[in-house]
């Protein structure tokens, strides 16, 4: 099960589980709330996300576009190898900002 949580000071959304058609609604709401409540870039911590389906990828692209329109960035942080492969196969790693180093402990 995906459990989106975020810490506003760091603009980090922590995800766990699978980002798919069943969970994308909750994640979309969390991301939109964070974007609306903050001014900085949005970081999505994917360290504990096992897989992302087409619906999840669509959400990431839509969020990327929304943050760009606001002059901000979406950063996908420390995705698991399975998610990195999906991003590479779909070539979204060329569009989305993917940071492969782990988040600092304080995040």
Segments (PLM) and residue ranges:
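STAS-like cytosolic regulatory interaction modules
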Residues: 1-51, 61-107
């Amino acid at each position: 099960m995906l459990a989106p949580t975020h810490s506003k000071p760091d603009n980090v959304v922590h995800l766990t589980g699978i980002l798919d058609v069943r969970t994308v609604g909750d994640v979309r709401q969390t991301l939109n709330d964070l974007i609306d409540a903050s001014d900085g870039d949005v970081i999505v911590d994917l360290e504990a996300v096992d897989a992302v389906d087409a619906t999840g990828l669509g959400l990431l692209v839509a969020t990327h576009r929304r943050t760009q329109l606001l002059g901000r960035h979406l950063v996908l942080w420390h995705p698991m190898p399975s998610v990195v492969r999906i991003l590479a196969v779909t070539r979204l790693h060329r569009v989305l900002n993917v940071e492969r180093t782990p988040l600092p402990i304080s995040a």
